[in-house]
């Protein structure tokens, strides 16, 4: 069966693994998921990610990040734009997550960017997710 929303599946796996204090989580690989993982790593929400060969296709493994006393680095994740209801933001009206403490991940003509990067470049796009 095909997956209708691979990004939502990725975020759900990440949320569930984070809640269960797992050290890593695996999922089917795609370029879009790898770019989302790049943003999460650059913003300090995950420790790293790697692409691995599986029996069928490839898989993406995210290494979760925790504080010294096993505090979660990700407090929450929310999918915003869904296949049934796309959500777009203009460059003049970009979302701010928790007053700037979290990030919004946008799909723009310049690739995947955070809300801060999109604001600096002056581009808008589809709001994929909020992470805080």
Curated annotation (Swiss-Prot):
GO terms for biological process: translation. One of its GO terms (cellular component) is ribosome. The keyword Ribosomal protein applies. Pfam families: Ribosomal_S8 (PF00410). Keywords: Ribonucleoprotein, Ribosomal protein, RNA-binding, rRNA-binding. One of the primary rRNA binding proteins, it binds directly to 16S rRNA central domain where it helps coordinate assembly of the platform of the 30S subunit. Part of the 30S ribosomal subunit. Contacts proteins S5 and S12. This is Small ribosomal subunit protein uS8. It comes from Pseudarthrobacter chlorophenolicus (strain ATCC 700700 / DSM 12829 / CIP 107037 / JCM 12360 / KCTC 9906 / NCIMB 13794 / A6).
